[in-house]
A protein has these predicted regions:
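Conserved non-catalytic scaffold segment of RNase H-like nuclease domains
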Residues: 1-110, 125, 133-140, 148-150
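Conserved beta-strand -> loop -> alpha-helix junction used to position metal-binding or nucleic-acid-contacting
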Residues: 108-120
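S-adenosyl-L-methionine-dependent methyltransferase catalytic core, i.e., the SAM/SAH-binding region
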Residues: 129
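Acidic two-metal-ion nuclease catalytic site recognized across multiple nuclease folds
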Residues: 135, 157, 161-176
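A short glycine-threonine-serine/GTX helix/turn-capping micro-motif
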Residues: 148-158
């Protein structure tokens, strides 16, 4: 079975402005194995607008690239092709689910696997269920860094790969 792990980075909520995605990253998992050759990402043009001070990520470094990035409508056919027809995996999938529903309210995506909810249920009592902390706890950080050299947390591709590796770990236990 093929799964798709994804992550959006968004502008965050700013009064008078919608929360918009500015980066999408994804990677496929087949039969429990993460397929690095399927990594895909895009920056998304959001126009000249403020970002929430609470929005984390590399957007400040990428202002020029974001200004030249395609609008989501330009890459939407490719996004749909990459996401439809596979179960979707995200860490705290509410953000990804909300973004996709907002962008295409008549399109059904999923089913969804939430690695955050899964980890909370399977491993009660951990000090933190943040993606980075879980990746560290399960000894996956080096593998994430090999897949996404020069990247770090709150980069959509890095986070999607981290989520995929975490999901793969859960699948290898025979419990996901």
């Amino acid at each position: 079975m093929v799964w798709t792990a994804l992550d959006f980075e968004t502008t965050g909520t700013v009064k008078g402005w919608p929360n918009e995605p500015w980066q999408l990253g994804l990677v496929k998992i087949e039969d429990g194995v993460v397929l690095p050759e399927t990594k895909w990402e895009t920056l998304l043009h959001v126009g000249d607008r403020p970002f929430s001070p609470r929005a984390v990520g590399r957007y400040a470094e990428l202002r020029e690239e974001l200004a030249a990035a395609p609008a989501i409508t330009d890459v939407w056919p490719e996004i749909v092709q990459r996401l439809c027809g596979t179960p979707l995996i995200a860490h705290n999938c509410a953000t990804e689910r909300t973004m996709l529903t907002k962008l295409a309210p008549m399109t059904v995506f999923g089913p969804w696997i939430d690695t955050l909810a899964y980890a909370r249920g399977r491993y009660p009592g951990l000090p933190s269920y943040a993606l980075g902390d879980l990746v560290e706890s399960f000894g996956l950080k080096d593998e994430v860094e090999r897949m996404c050299p020069g990247r770090t947390w709150h980069d959509a591709l890095y986070d999607a790969c981290a989520c995929a590796l975490l999901a793969s770990r859960f699948m290898s236990e025979g419990v996901a």
